[in-house]
Amino acid sequence: FHGYLERNWPPATRNRHLRGYRLSVRNMLRAHIRAHKHIHEIYRGKGWTPDARVGIALHFMDFAPSRPGKKRDRFATWLAEQLFQDEPSMAHARGHFLPPYGFPHRYNNFPEGSGDFTDFVGVSYYRRFRVRFHPRGRIVERPDSSAPTSDLGWEIDAEGLRRVCEACHESLGKPLFITGN
């Protein structure tokens, strides 16, 4: 995310269609699914019990529209949630790759097969992200200037951790572990 969209970390590139970002996320998703299958095959093949618990730790943000009364900000917020959280977590868990990580009608959206590919979810939550629509289609953060912030300037919102955990559990139905806060 940071390397392709914000250019903060390697590869520090951006292109119009986010091709590099999509491909890197798609490759990470496929690697997780393959590792999950392989680890479980090894455990079952050796008769080891209890079976391995293979999960994912994902960075979640509590996305909120900067201006809740503006349809454009609400849409940009929904889009940010889909791209950054919902679609990657569903692909990890179920193997279903939705756009932009999957390609409807042209390719198989279950490149590693459909199934249940995570046994738990690690939730790393650090901030609330207030989204403001940008006419060029970028996802732009507009923090609430009155909200408390961390040393990194990120908006602190303890209730956001609860909201993120509830949404994650509702969509995936997996045990949750707080892996970062």
Where are each of the predicted segments found?
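Active-site region of glycoside hydrolase catalytic domains
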Residues: 1-181
